[in-house]
């Protein structure tokens, strides 16, 4: 078994996601020879942890381990706990993780969690509705969109053609917002409700000729086989392009489940600024993405009442 947590909580060097990815780039094509000593030793820790089960089967000591055991192994091997646990998860039969690792579609995609045929057990299931709504929603400031469009457009190198496509993707959203703000000088936000969302989404993307799946293909290639070519400037932009493409695909296919809000005074990550938000109003959107692939989903809670309301929100009968 394994436990998944965020890089922010577990990195022994207190590095951000971008700084970490920069440090663990392979040197000379050798994946175990990176600039992060702890990352280079995480496979040693994975092998050490596997001995708990092996030795337990021979009766030497219990096969189960707790976090104190794990901490001792990490300290002894001087390894990265984040990548050690991810390595252990690849062969694990049981994985513990936060809600959003499953029900935030982009977190699940980035973590590479495969839930085909899995039994998913949700503790404190009464929180699931809000988690599902948040996991299928997105918000962007106009400044953020413009910055990433510029960062990707200025990239020069072997991936210039691909980053240019992503830059046009951001620019399409920027053009839409700027056009709306020119036509409407009101400080009040515009709320587009479910029956109008599909037409609005096409309007947002009208200046972008490429299909959204093509965006995901580019992002997947840039973050895997070509990750060494990304820089601390382009990496966050590429990651966000993938996240937004996924949300827009959901908006297109489940348009009646969404409201789209844009305005000059949006609350984006605690700041008041021009921006746009794609708000999922139906938890069933994220829940079905998991339920479709999982073998079963078991919810436990002392407060799942009334059940009829909960079933209606998640779009399934228990």
What are these regions (language model features)?
Residues 3, 121, 298-299:
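Structured core elements
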Residues 70-92, 103-112, 215-318:
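A contiguous, basic/glycine-rich beta-loop/short-helix subdomain that forms a polymer-engagement track
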């Amino acid at each position: 078994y394994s436990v998944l947590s965020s890089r922010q909580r577990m990195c022994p060097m207190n590095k951000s996601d971008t700084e970490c990815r920069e440090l663990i780039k392979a040197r000379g094509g050798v994946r175990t020879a990176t600039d992060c000593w702890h990352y280079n030793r995480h496979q040693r820790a994975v092998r050490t942890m596997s001995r708990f089960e092996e030795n337990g089967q021979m009766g030497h000591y219990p096969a189960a381990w707790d976090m104190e055991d794990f901490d001792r192994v990490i300290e002894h091997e001087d390894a990265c706990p984040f990548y050690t646990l991810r390595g252990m998860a690849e062969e694990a039969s049981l994985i513990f993780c936060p809600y959003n690792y499953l029900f935030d579609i982009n977190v699940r995609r980035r973590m590479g969690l495969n839930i085909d045929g899995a039994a998913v057990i949700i503790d404190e299931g009464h929180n699931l509705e809000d988690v599902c709504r948040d996991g299928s929603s997105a918000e962007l400031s106009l400044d953020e969109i413009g910055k990433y469009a510029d960062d990707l457009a200025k990239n020069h190198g072997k991936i210039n053609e691909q980053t240019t496509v992503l830059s046009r993707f951001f620019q399409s959203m920027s053009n839409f917002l700027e056009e709306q703000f020119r036509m409407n000088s009101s400080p009040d936000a515009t709320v587009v409700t479910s029956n109008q969302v599909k037409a609005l989404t096409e309007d947002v993307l009208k200046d972008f000729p490429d299909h959204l799946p093509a965006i995901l293909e580019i992002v997947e290639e840039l973050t895997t086989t070509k990750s060494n070519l990304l820089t601390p400037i382009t990496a966050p932009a590429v990651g966000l392009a993938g996240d937004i493409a996924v949300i827009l695909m959901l908006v297109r296919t489940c348009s009646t489940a969404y409201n789209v809000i844009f305005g000059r005074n949006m609350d984006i990550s605690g700041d008041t600024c021009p921006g746009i938000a794609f708000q999922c109003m139906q938890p069933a959107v994220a829940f079905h993405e998991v339920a479709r692939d999982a073998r079963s989903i078991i919810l436990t809670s002392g407060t799942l009442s009334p059940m009829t309301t909960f079933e209606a929100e998640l779009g399934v009968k228990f």
